[in-house]
C-alpha cells in the first residue's frame, strides 16, 4: 500500500470508534487510580480537547491492486485531551462538562480513547459498573444503516458476551496499567499521574487512514509500552451527507494488550 500526502489545509474530518465485549470472569482489583472509594455523589468533571496542533491535508492511498482512495482535508498531528479526574460511573460520564458546546461524548472523535481508558480503569474496582461504562462509551446500541438494514454496533451486549473475550483480557493484562496512557503514570506512582487534570496525547499520521473511510486509527502513547498503540475509531453517517452522527471505539482489548502482569 502506498500513501501520499497531496496538499494541505481545511476543515476537520471526524471519525469514530467501536467496541467488543466482556464476559463473566471477575477481575481482581489491582489498586491505584486515586481513591478506591467512590465519591458520595456524582460529580460534573471537566474534559478538554486541544486540536491546535493539527494540520489538515489531502491524502491519496494506492493499494497493491491499483485501487485508489482519496481523502480531503484529513487531520494530521497531535491532539491533547484531558480529564479532571477518573469518572467512576455512567452517571459521571453523562454529567461531564464537555468543550465546544457538545452535549454528548460521542460527538467528538478524540474523546473516545480518553473515556474508554477511564471506563477500563473502573475494572480495578467494580466489574459491573465498568461494563456499563464500557458499553456507554462504546455506543452499545442498534440503529438503522443508510440502506435500511439493521446493523449491530460493537459494544452491545457487553454483560452477556462470550466469557472467552473477558478471560483473555484478564489473563494478559493488568487493569491498573491501563492508566499508563496518561502522561506521567508509572509504576512509581501506582500508574496514577501526580497532577490533575490527567493528560493524554493522541496522534494522527499517514497510517491513521486506510481504504475504509469509516475508520481512523488513533495512536496512543503508554509509559509502559515501547511503541505507540493504534486504536480504531469508527464514525457513523446516517444519511451519507458527510456529517457524522456519532463516533465509537473498537475493541477494548486492544488497549489492554501487552499490559501484562510482569
Regions found by a protein language model. Give the residues of each.
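Core segments of small alpha/beta cavity-forming domains
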Residues: 41-43, 55-181
Amino acid at each position: 500500500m502506498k500513501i501520499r500526502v497531496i496538499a494541505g489545509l481545511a476543515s476537520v474530518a471526524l471519525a469514530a470508534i467501536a467496541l467488543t465485549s466482556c464476559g463473566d470472569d471477575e477481575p481482581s482489583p489491582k489498586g491505584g487510580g486515586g481513591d478506591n472509594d467512590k465519591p458520595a455523589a456524582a460529580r460534573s468533571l471537566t474534559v478538554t480537547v486541544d486540536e491546535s496542533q493539527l494540520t489538515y491535508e489531502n491524502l491519496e492511498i494506492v493499494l497493491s491492486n491499483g485501487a485508489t482512495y482519496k481523502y480531503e482535508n484529513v487531520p494530521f498531528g497531535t491532539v491533547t485531551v484531558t480529564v479532571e479526574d477518573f469518572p467512576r460511573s455512567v452517571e459521571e460520564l453523562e454529567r461531564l462538562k464537555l468543550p465546544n458546546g457538545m452535549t454528548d461524548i460521542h460527538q467528538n472523535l478524540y474523546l473516545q480513547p480518553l473515556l474508554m481508558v477511564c471506563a477500563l480503569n473502573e475494572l480495578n474496582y467494580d466489574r459491573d459498573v465498568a461494563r456499563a461504562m464500557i458499553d456507554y462509551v462504546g455506543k452499545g446500541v442498534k440503529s438503522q444503516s443508510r440502506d435500511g438494514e439493521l446493523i449491530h454496533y460493537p459494544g452491545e451486549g457487553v454483560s452477556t458476551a462470550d466469557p472467552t473475550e473477558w478471560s483473555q483480557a484478564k489473563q494478559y493484562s493488568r487493569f491498573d496499567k491501563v492508566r499508563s496512557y496518561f502522561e506521567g503514570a508509572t509504576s512509581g506512582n501506582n500508574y496514577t499521574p501526580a497532577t490533575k487534570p490527567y493528560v493524554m496525547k493522541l496522534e494522527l499520521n499517514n497510517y491513521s487512514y486506510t481504504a475504509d473511510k469509516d475508520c481512523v486509527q488513533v495512536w496512543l502513547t503508554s509509559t509502559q509500552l515501547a511503541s505507540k498503540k493504534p486504536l480504531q475509531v469508527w464514525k457513523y453517517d446516517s444519511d451519507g451527507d458527510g456529517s457524522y452522527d456519532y463516533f465509537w471505539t473498537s475493541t477494548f482489548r486492544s488497549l489492554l494488550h501487552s499490559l501484562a502482569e510482569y
